[in-house]
């Protein structure tokens, strides 16, 4: 068997990184002094690393982050906001995901909720958790269109199945009765087997009223599906009169969401 034949077979098996590394070994005289087992181990390591990197890129691309540049290390703790650094660092380990616990990030417009949520989402991707970002208004539109088109189950699964789901602009607008049913169904499917990150301008205590309060038979049921054992980050200002939008701090276009 010729070396070219070996490389062709590696490429046919989609072991492209290994094929490229094998070609490099053949062209480098120094590798002749390295035992076969070590050479083969290097080839396997290169292919393995390539596949892991490609998988990570796929996860990040499919997540659809609003702010894909978000980085947990770049969260600004000196911008006049009250932030629990210890809690944020603990959440960055993604232990809450293996525990199937939720995360509530609340605060005023421009305080950095979306950036923080995307940063947590990026950490989830780095640990190879299937992650999805979506604005709640967009999700509800998707489900309404899918109901009309006969694809409701498929679209619902698209949002129910990810290990981590980031729901931005959570309850920014009060949902209709039909939308409440969709929200309940989604959160019921995700309960105790996945983690959801909720980003909202409203503090948790206000969510019940945003869901219709006593007039809605589903308000209690929805809150019950998400409230237990949740982590909560409420981003508040130290000096509201001198606040600087986190869009400016992170160098984002001011027309973007937080």
Name the predicted role of every residue range:
Residues 11, 16-67:
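Interdomain "pre-motor" coupling segment immediately N-terminal to P-loop NTPase/helicase cores
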Residues 70-94:
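N-terminal pre-Walker A segment at the start of P-loop NTPase domains
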Residues 75, 117, 135:
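Conserved hydrophobic/aromatic pocket- or pore-lining residues that grip, position, or stack substrates
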Residues 100-116:
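Walker A/P-loop nucleotide-binding motif
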Residues 101, 128-130, 161-164, 192-198:
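Loop/turn-to-beta-strand initiation segments
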Residues 121-134:
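Post-Walker A helix-loop "phosphate-sensing" segment adjacent to the P-loop in P-loop NTPases
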């Amino acid at each position: 068997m010729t070396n070219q034949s070996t490389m062709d077979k590696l490429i046919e098996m989609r072991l492209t990184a290994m094929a490229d590394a094998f070609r490099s070994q053949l062209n480098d005289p120094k590798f002749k002094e390295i035992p076969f087992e070590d050479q083969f181990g290097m080839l396997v390591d290169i292919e393995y690393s390539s596949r892991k990197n490609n998988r990570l890129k796929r996860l990040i691309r499919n997540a659809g982050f609003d702010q894909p540049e978000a980085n947990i290390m770049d969260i600004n703790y000196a911008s006049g906001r009250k932030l629990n650094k210890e809690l944020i660092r603990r959440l960055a380990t993604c232990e809450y995901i293996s525990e199937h616990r939720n995360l509530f990030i609340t605060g005023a417009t421009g305080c950095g909720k979306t950036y923080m949520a995307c940063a947590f989402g990026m950490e989830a991707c780095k640990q190879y958790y299937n992650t999805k970002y979506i604005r709640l208004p967009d999700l509800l539109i998707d489900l309404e269109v899918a109901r009309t088109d006969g694809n409701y189950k498929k679209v619902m699964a698209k949002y129910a199945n990810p290990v981590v789901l980031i729901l931005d602009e959570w309850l920014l607008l009060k949902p209709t009765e039909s939308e409440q049913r969709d929200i309940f169904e989604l959160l019921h499917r995700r309960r105790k087997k996945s983690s959801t990150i909720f980003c909202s301008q409203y503090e948790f205590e206000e969510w019940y009223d945003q869901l219709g309060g006593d007039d809605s038979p589903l308000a209690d049921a929805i809150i019950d599906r998400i409230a237990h054992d949740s982590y909560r980050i409420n981003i508040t200002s130290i000096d509201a009169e001198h606040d600087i939008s986190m869009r400016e701090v992170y160098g984002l276009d001011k027309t973007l969401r937080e």
